[in-house]
């Protein structure tokens, strides 16, 4: 596995630990205001400075990790489960089922740019973490379905699957016992890249005012609130922006490293 993958695991691990232990790491209440301390730069008391309401930026970035990872993990889990089931059905049964799912359903969802579709869904459903997760799941499952369909189409022709069919095993047994366990490796890569996409999408929608509503410390909301004061107080925008960039890079590094590790052709290069 590449060095970048290990760097990605290290960075992602730090953010996961920050999310888990946020109440113990954060030095201030994330909603506590102190107007006398507005836009104070980084100090020993406020490591990342304060924002326009005197709130501690470090504490808000730490709790923002919890929000971003909650959204990312939930979106990836739900999208992967639903996409795996639909993709496996399409690839295993083939024929009309495959033509309908991969030729029509998949293409309908892929015809729209993902972020624009998410914006439309959130605008319809309303703001909130649960509704944001639902919108991102709607646009996210198709990627997993396409990967799983391709894997099932390949694995179902292997000798051990044909032998199980000849011995009279049921379709469900063949699918869940012989095919899926040998087709999930690419989904691991897809999930790590999906985490990066979900974190970035959550931040983008929150930046547009369609994600996690204030005063929750979403990284995207923090960037949106700070952008007009960047010239005078760059720290307010820099730290949440850096958190977004590092998280997205970390999971992309992990995905690339896992692809190289799990693919023998990539390892031999």
Annotate each PLM feature:
Residues 21, 81-86, 97, 131, ...:
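Membrane-embedded alpha-helices of multi-pass transport/permease systems
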Residues 110, 121-125, 136, 152, ...:
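Glycine-rich helix-loop "coupling/hinge" segments at transmembrane-helix boundaries
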